Every structure is written in structure tokens, then in C-alpha cells.
Amino acid sequence: MENNVKKETIVDSEKVEKQQPVTAPVVNKKENTQPKAKTFKRETTTSNFEERVVKIKRISKTTKGGRMMRFSALVVIGDKNGTVGFGMGKSIEVPDAIKKAIKNANNNLIKVKQTKKGSIYHDVNGRHGAAKVMLLPAPEGTGIIAGGPVRAVVELAGFTDIYTKSRGANAPMNVIRATINGLLQQLTPQEIARLRDKSLKEL
């Protein structure tokens, strides 16, 4: 009996060896795993810019349900190196209105000319609507003779010595536009010489 049991066990073991082992398919974890999305830090172009809130006022909009109260903010930004911009934002909350105004100002950046001493090249007169702004060069050490929205524009643009005079309407938005229009009228000595077909020494 013992011999028969041994033979059966030997036969069974031989059958097991002859049978091909069933192996589970190898799963490549690297292939199945989806690549992680890369996170990029968006660099803001206005990191070196300064903001100045010129005016905040409360506005209302009449709807079927009644009056909807909101706030509007007028902001001027600049890098004090010849780049300046302005924008307006509206929202239910004042901070949100200021953020929208800054975002709008980023899309309205302009480059203005200035001398090495921080003044303008010559007299200019800017106008927008009924607002008029006169800008005059000033000697070094004079400072900024301006007030209100005009001062915000010339300071953030980087001017250090300048005379200004605002006349006509005093709406902040129109005054800012008039100031920028005046600054854009500047001509450098090289540009004036080119227009007159003369050299710098002949001017």
C-alpha cells in the first residue's frame, strides 16, 4: 500500500511539472499612470508697478427688481520709468473694483518720453473733452508741481521736476486722459532735427 501511495505521488508531481505554470501578466505601472500636469507660475508684468487709487465712488443701476448699488474705482499704475497706465473697475465690493481697475490698467499701458533729469522736453498742452492740462519743463530740484489726477500720472510715470496746470472740466478720467495726451505730444531733439532737416547743432 505504501508503495502504491508513493507511485501516485510521484506521478502527480510529474504531471504538475509538465503543466505550464500560469503567470499573471506583468502590469507596467509607468505605462498606466497618467503624467501629472505641470504647474506653471504665471509671472505678472506689473510686479514692479505701483498703483494709486485716484477716485472711488458709489454708483447705482436701476433694474426691474430695484436699484443695484455698486462701486467704481479709478486707478493709475506706473513703474516710474516712463511706463504708465490707467483703468476703471466696477463691482459690488470696493476691493474687487480696485482689482478690476488694476487689471484694466495693465491693458492700457503706454510709454512716455522724459529727459535724463526727469522732466519733459518742451511745453505741451493736452486735452480730452472739456479738460485741459498744460505741462511745462522745470529745472532740477523743483519737484512736481501738480495735484489730483495729474500728480498721480506724472509721479508714477517717473517725472521728478515738472510744472502742470489743469483747466476746464475736473472729471478725473478726462484729466488723466488729457495729461497722457499731452505727454504723448513730446518730441525729442533728435526728432525735431529730423523734421526740420537740420542737425542738433543747428537747433
Curated annotation (Swiss-Prot):
GO biological process: translation
Compositional bias of kind Basic and acidic residues: 1-18
A Pfam family per the record: Ribosomal_S5_C
Keywords tagged on the record: Ribonucleoprotein, Ribosomal protein, RNA-binding, rRNA-binding
One annotated GO molecular function: structural constituent of ribosome
Region (Disordered): 1-36
Claim: Cytoplasm is one of the keywords in the record: no
Keyword Disulfide bond assigned: no
InterPro entries: Ribosomal_Su5_D2-typ_SF, Ribosomal_uS5, Ribosomal_uS5_bac-type, Ribosomal_uS5_C, Ribosomal_uS5_N, Ribosomal_uS5_N_CS, Ribsml_uS5_D2-typ_fold_subgr
GO cellular component: small ribosomal subunit
Residue ranges constituting the S5 DRBM domain according to the UniProt record: 49-112
Function (record text): With S4 and S12 plays an important role in translational accuracy. Located at the back of the 30S subunit body where it stabilizes the conformation of the head with respect to the body.
Entry domain remark: The N-terminal domain interacts with the head of the 30S subunit; the C-terminal domain interacts with the body and contacts protein S4. The interaction surface between S4 and S5 is involved in control of translational fidelity.
Subunit structure: Part of the 30S ribosomal subunit. Contacts proteins S4 and S8.
PANTHER family xrefs: MITOCHONDRIAL RIBOSOMAL PROTEIN S5
Family per record: Belongs to the universal ribosomal protein uS5 family.
Database matches in HAMAP family: Ribosomal_uS5_B (MF_01307_B)
Protein name as it appears in the record: Small ribosomal subunit protein uS5
This protein's encoding gene: rpsE
